[in-house]
Regions:
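Short acidic/histidine-rich motifs immediately flanking catalytic phosphotransfer sites
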Residues: 48-53
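Short, surface-exposed alpha-helical segments at coil->helix boundaries
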Residues: 15-18, 61-68
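Short, well-ordered alpha-helices that flank and scaffold nucleotide-derived cofactor binding pockets
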Residues: 19, 23-27, 69, 96, ...
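Short secondary-structure boundary segments
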Residues: 57-59
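Short acidic active-site motifs
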Residues: 41-45, 63, 90
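Conserved active-site segments centered on acidic
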Residues: 2-5, 9-41
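Ser/Thr/Gly-rich flexible loops in soluble cytosolic domains mediating phosphotransfer, phosphorylation
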Residues: 3, 77-102
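A short, gly/pro- and small-residue-rich
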Residues: 64-83
């Protein structure tokens, strides 16, 4: 199972994106645990849960270096979600990109 954590401003759009990614994973028969957290919650999840990849919403891309430093010892990839894919809520494209990085 691949665990994918999205860090975002925790809005409605991210909830829809998580749902679209979960649907795409089910269609591809890929076992995943995909969830979204706010920037304030990210540290807690990174220290208590096995995360395979961190995806940042475009609106919080400024956090990349800060989070990368915190997870450098864990070798967890961190990636900013493509703005176009985010705007189109393209869960399949975002999932494919995430799976290529793990």
């Amino acid at each position: 199972m691949k665990t994918i954590m999205l860090v975002c401003a925790a809005g409605v759009s991210t909830g829809m994106l998580v749902s679209n990614m979960q649907k795409a994973a089910k269609e591809k028969d890929v076992e995943t645990d995909i969830f979204a957290v706010s920037p304030n919650e990210a540290d807690g999840y990174l220290s208590t849960k096995e995360i395979d990849i961190v995806l940042l919403g475009p609106q919080v891309k400024f956090l990349k270096d800060q989070l990368k430093e915190k997870i450098s010892s864990k070798n967890i990839p961190i990636e900013i979600i493509d703005m176009r894919d985010f705007e189109h809520m393209d869960g399949a494209a975002i999932l494919d990109r995430a799976l290529k990085l793990v």
